[in-house]
């Protein structure tokens, strides 16, 4: 069912049924069976003081274009780093939803996450081994990285900077634990939103002699534990509000396409091109596919799945096709079905460069045409209606970003 077909300004509850086979026997599980409706892992909001208010399933609502007197209450966030300082601000959204579960005039209508849902270029040292192993487990095979003469499991925590700078031609100065394989990118998304995907224990670092490195590692563990405690709340938020996401640079790598020189240098590196493609494929799977699934053709999906389904043995042609397809795909801009309509623009892959090292224009002519085309495809948009524009990269005061 298309999201726009749901009734507007009406509280909607839902359940999910997962079907699978054990041998020839088909089995099904729902949210209750998965332990997601009770206890610490519950993704529902309850009012313990008034039984009439209790809703025993996750809920959401859709604000519509005919609700002219109904507010569009937007929650907005960006730049969420698991080892960042302080508390996870995304948890604030949980309190806002909990305070207005059935009051749709006050309850947040949508959540906009407008860049850097992960920091691929600056993963935490205590997590990197787990991300590598978890990523391999997810795929069922260990991805071969062109130009890397060793396995990712053979690279220690904090030891990736040289590969990133010299071989991938990236400019991140914090790339000691830069994500590389598709599996690592996928694992990073899965631990960012679900506590059950975390390691039971963090890898010891007692073998490191340098006190400064040890201290940094221990600080990162404390920061990660703080983020970890907020994850049940984060999952509940995402289960109870329509959420739309767009990338900026850190979802792929710091300084992504910041200048023509950067773009051309990385294009000349098979290693760098493969990492960017892996990041884009993971962005599609974990962020933007849910924004508007109709944007992605069977050809696009096949281009990704053919590579990932090769069980660790993709041939050179399959890998090249995967990388080239993602590097030459530019239809990331999309419209969120709000009123006014919201256009999320891709301000990274359709830039215009007037010089080798100078700041770019955020959008080239094709990018501007994409915005126009995307807007007029919205069936309830009429010329002259207001539009919300979401740009992950700053529009005003923009220089090199």
Enumerate the language-model features and the residues they cover.
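Metal-dependent phosphoester/phosphodiester hydrolase catalytic core
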Residues: 1-401
């Amino acid at each position: 069912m298309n999201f726009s077909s749901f009734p507007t300004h009406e509280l909607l509850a839902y359940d999910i049924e997962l079907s699978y086979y054990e041998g020839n026997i088909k089995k099904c599980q729902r949210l209750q069976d998965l332990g997601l409706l009770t206890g610490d892992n519950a993704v529902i909001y309850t009012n313990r003081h008034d039984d009439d208010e209790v809703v025993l399933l996750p809920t959401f609502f859709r604000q519509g274009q005919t609700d002219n007197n109904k507010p569009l209450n937007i929650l907005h966030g960006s730049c969420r780093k698991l080892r960042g300082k302080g508390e996870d601000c995304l948890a604030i959204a949980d309190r806002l939803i909990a305070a207005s579960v059935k009051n749709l005039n006050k309850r947040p209508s949508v959540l906009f996450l407008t860049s850097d849902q992960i920091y691929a270029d600056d993963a935490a040292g205590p997590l990197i081994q787990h991300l590598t192993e978890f990523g391999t487990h997810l795929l069922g095979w260990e991805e071969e990285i062109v130009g890397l003469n060793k396995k990712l499991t053979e690279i220690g925590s904090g030891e990736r900077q040289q590969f990133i700078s010299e071989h991938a031609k990236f400019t991140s100065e914090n790339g000691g634990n830069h994500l590389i394989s598709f599996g690592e990118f996928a694992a990073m998304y899965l631990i960012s939103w679900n506590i059950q995907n975390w390691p039971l224990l963090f890898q010891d670092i007692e073998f490191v002699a340098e006190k400064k490195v040890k201290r940094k590692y221990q600080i990162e563990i404390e920061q990660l534990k703080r983020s970890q405690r907020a994850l049940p709340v984060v999952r509940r938020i995402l289960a109870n509000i329509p959420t739309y996401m767009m990338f900026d640079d850190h979802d792929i790598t710091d300084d992504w396409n910041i200048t023509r020189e950067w773009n051309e240098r990385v294009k000349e590196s098979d290693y760098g091109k493969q990492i960017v493609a892996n990041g884009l494929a993971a962005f599609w799977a974990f962020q933007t596919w849910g924004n508007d699934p109709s944007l992605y053709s069977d050809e696009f999906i096949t281009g990704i799945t053919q590579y990932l389904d090769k069980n660790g043995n993709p041939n050179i042609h399959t890998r090249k096709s995967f990388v080239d397809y993602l590097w030459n795909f530019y239809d990331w801009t999309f419209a969120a079905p709000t009123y006014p309509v919201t256009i999320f623009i891709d301000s990274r892959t359709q830039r215009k460069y007037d010089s080798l090292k100078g700041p770019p224009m955020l959008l080239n002519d094709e990018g501007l045409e994409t915005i126009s085309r995307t807007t007029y495809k919205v069936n309830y948009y009429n010329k002259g209606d207001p539009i919300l524009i979401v740009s992950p990269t700053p529009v005003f005061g923009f220089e090199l970003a």
